[in-house]
C-alpha cells in the first residue's frame, strides 16, 4: 500500500560548529531532532530519519527509536549532501509525496506544515514534482519542502553522474511549485536553524 505523504528528516550534517552530534544537542529541554519528529508524529505522518554514518551511538539510536518507532537510515555514500539524504529516505518509504525537514529547526510548527501540504492538489494539477517555499528576495527553502516520488529517477541520475549535487540543480528539473514563505509563517521563524553553540545558547 502506497502512503500519500511520508516524512524525511535530514540529520546527516557533521555539525562541527555545534560540537558534533547536532541532532542530539539540547535546545529548551529537547533534542533538536525531537522538534520535527514530534510534529510529524502528531500529524500521523510516517517518517524516516537519515543520519550520517557513525554519527550516533547505539544508546542514542535506541532511545530515539523507542520514542518515535520510526525508521532510520544512513547515508549510502558520505559527502553527497542533502540529496543523498533525500534519496535514502525515498528508498526506505513507499509514498507518493515526501515532506523533507531538517533536524535543526526547532521553531517548526504543525500549522505551517499543514499549509505546505495543502498545496499538493495544485502541484498534482500542474505536474509539479516539488513544492518549495520562496522568500521575497528569491531565497528558497528546499529543505523545508515537498518532493514527489516521481522525482526519484531524476535524483538517482544526478547522484550517479556526480557532477552537480546542488539541490537547486536538482529542483531545476522538477517544474517546481513555489509558494510564498510568509504564507506558512509571517515571521518566517520556522525556517531558522541552529548551527553553532552560540545560537543554541542565544535562542533559549
Curated annotation (Swiss-Prot):
The keyword Transport does not apply. This is Probable molybdenum cofactor guanylyltransferase. It comes from Methanocaldococcus jannaschii (strain ATCC 43067 / DSM 2661 / JAL-1 / JCM 10045 / NBRC 100440). GTP binds at residues 10-12, 22, 75, 104. Its main location: cytoplasm. GO terms for cellular component: cytoplasm. Transfers a GMP moiety from GTP to Mo-molybdopterin (Mo-MPT) cofactor (Moco or molybdenum cofactor) to form Mo-molybdopterin guanine dinucleotide (Mo-MGD) cofactor. GO terms for biological process: Mo-molybdopterin cofactor biosynthetic process.
Amino acid at each position: 500500500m502506497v502512503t500519500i505523504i511520508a516524512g524525511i528528516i535530514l540529520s546527516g550534517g557533521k555539525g562541527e560548529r555545534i560540537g558534533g552530534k547536532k541532532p542530539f544537542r539540547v535546545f529548551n529541554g529537547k533534542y533538536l531532532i525531537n522538534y520535527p519528529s514530534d510534529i510529524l508524529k502528531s500529524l500521523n505522518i510516517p517518517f524516516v530519519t537519515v543520519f550520517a554514518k557513525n554519527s550516533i551511538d547505539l544508546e542514542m539510536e535506541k532511545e530515539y527509536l523507542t520514542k518515535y518507532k520510526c525508521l532510520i537510515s544512513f547515508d549510502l555514500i558520505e559527502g553527497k549532501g542533502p540529496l543523498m539524504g533525500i534519496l535514502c529516505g525515498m528508498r526506505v518509504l513507499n509514498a507518493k509525496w515526501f515532506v523533507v525537514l531538517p533536524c535543526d529547526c526547532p521553531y517548526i510548527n504543525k500549522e505551517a506544515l499543514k499549509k505546505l501540504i495543502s498545496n499538493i492538489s495544485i502541484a498534482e494539477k500542474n505536474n509539479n514534482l516539488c513544492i518549495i517555499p520562496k522568500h521575497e528576495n528569491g531565497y528558497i527553502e528546499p529543505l523545508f519542502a515537498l518532493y514527489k516520488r516521481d522525482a526519484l529517477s531524476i535524483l538517482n541520475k544526478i547522484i550517479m553522474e556526480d557532477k552537480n549535487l546542488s539541490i537547486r540543480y536538482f529542483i531545476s528539473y522538477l517544474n517546481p511549485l513555489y509558494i510564498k514563505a510568509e504564507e506558512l509563517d509571517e515571521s518566517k521563524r520556522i525556517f531558522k536553524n541552529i548551527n553553532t553553540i552560540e545560537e543554541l545558547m542565544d535562542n533559549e
